[in-house]
Amino acid sequence: MTQQDLTTAVKKKGLSRFIHLGKKLGNGVTAVGQGFYVVYRHQLYKQPNNPENTRYVQWFCRRLCDVFNIEVRIEGEPAGHEPALWVSNHISWLDIPALGSGARVFFLAKAEIEQWPIVGKLAKGGGTLFIKRGSGDSLRIRQQIADFLKQNIPVLFFPEATTSDGQEVKRIHGRLLGAAIEAQQPVQIALLCYVNQHGELDQIAPYIGEMSFSEHVMHVLEMPRVTAHLRFLPRIDVTGHTLDSLTHEVQQKMRTGLHELHQQVLHHALDG
């Protein structure tokens, strides 16, 4: 190959990448616009936590998964619609559209997201609850979640309180599980992993390290198709549980369940 041929190939590759990103960004803008249309068309902001609104949240999450080239696949029994406090392992901001595609729930998110342009307003209109990490605000949020559960409003949060590479479940923080005990509603564990086309845990989907959100979005827009595998465990009856005993059971079942999910969907299952 001559130098001229090499230069031409590089230019074509750059142009192809530019066109691909342009289409993805265009699809993303369209999806966000559709999300705002749904919020205002159905006036979701007036009753953002009405359980009926979860169908709109699910629709929007599925649109986002299409934009980000994520196929959502449920392993085992699908999620029920009965009220519960939902918990899941946490890998990326992509967890929200992935989980929201498979389950009709409202999400708990860090308070900073409420201030994000566009995304914050859309999340608030979609019934997201916001919590200030590391502050006394968690007591207020726990009470608010308990009140929602008593009204049969499903809420999902990430008890690890941080993201991981998806290989294992970190130590969970169980304070908010007290909402399930107070409301006497079960705990529903959801587990997920992102698998690439080689049958391995995807390395692009995890939002970890020092990368900024905008940088990670650009990486995600360029990534090949990824499958988000979801697994819903049998619900945990909170009757007779203390906060400590419930936290321990949730921790153990999340770790065991994620390992079993890996064994099921990965070509070369992880050790441990």
Regions found by a protein language model. Give the residues of each.
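A transmembrane-helix-recognition feature enriched in membrane-embedded lipid enzymes
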Residues: 7-74, 121-125
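A cross-family acyltransferase "interaction/gating" segment
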Residues: 118-121, 134, 167-249, 261-271
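Catalytic-site beta-strand/loop segments enriched in glycine and acidic/polar residues
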Residues: 148-177
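Residue-level preference for the first positions of well-ordered beta-strands
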Residues: 83-85, 152-158, 186
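Soluble, non-transmembrane catalytic domains of enzymes that act on hydrophobic metabolites at membranes
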Residues: 1-10, 62-76, 94-96, 106, ...
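Catalytic core of membrane glycerolipid acyltransferases/transacylases, capturing the structured
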Residues: 37-53, 65-67, 78-136
